[in-house]
């Protein structure tokens, strides 16, 4: 083996060794950045799995290169504003089977346009801000939540109109119209425009106000009549108590008779 071949062999060995060393550092770095209670792997991009980890909130130390994030089957109750804003490569987000009740207006800021799958099924979501899902391109799963069907939900689902599955699986737990409770949202929306309903609340308030005024007027009239009757009775008793001015039989007439 000549010197050139020996040099090439040693150079190749050094390159392979350096490459292995760099890969080890990267793997160690990724592992060290993995949130507590989660498992991280690099299969098809960084996969962060935090399922069944007894998490009460979304970790704030998620690696920025996360592509798939599984936070299902925990005890998370809310999704704060901009919690995912640094995860620009995020494609899949699973938050199913938690106790989520609140989703802030800008919860998905930074990932709304890159997400491909969003799973919020099997939570406790009753309503969300009308802008919570703005620009969301993901296929969203929001079934098995106690949704309150009203104008806001109608606006939210209309903003996600490209995803028919999203609205199709929404069942109204409660509704501004009692007859829609327990029915699929699409059926309720076909029956009535939830953003253009008669203002029954105003009518009820007006009726209550009118009834209150009517009651006050009747009460005043009854009081006034009774008070007048009492005053009349007292006046009559007073008159009866005065001495009688009857003429005595032996008193001469005041008028003299002219003979």
From Swiss-Prot:
Glycosylation sites: 47, 94
Pfam families on file: LRR_1, LRR_8, LRRNT
Predominant cellular place of this UniProt entry's protein: membrane
Gene3D superfamilies in UniProt: Ribonuclease Inhibitor
Family annotation (InterPro entries): Leu-rich_rpt, Leu-rich_rpt_typical-subtyp, LRR_dom_sf, LRRNT
Record keyword RNA-binding present: no
Ranges of residues in domain LRRNT: 34-64
GO CC, any one term: membrane
UniProt keyword terms in alphabetical order: Glycoprotein, Leucine-rich repeat, Membrane, Repeat, Signal, Transmembrane, Transmembrane helix
LRR repeat spans: 65-86, 89-110, 114-135
Ranges annotated as spanning the membrane: 205-225
Localization (cell): Membrane
Signal peptide limits: 1-33
The LRRCT domain, residue ranges: 145-197
UniProt keyword annotation of Transmembrane helix present: yes
Record membrane topology: Single-pass membrane protein
Family: Belongs to the LRRC3 family.
Record-given protein name: Leucine-rich repeat-containing protein 3B
Organism ancestry: Eukaryota, Metazoa, Chordata, Craniata, Vertebrata
Gene: LRRC3B
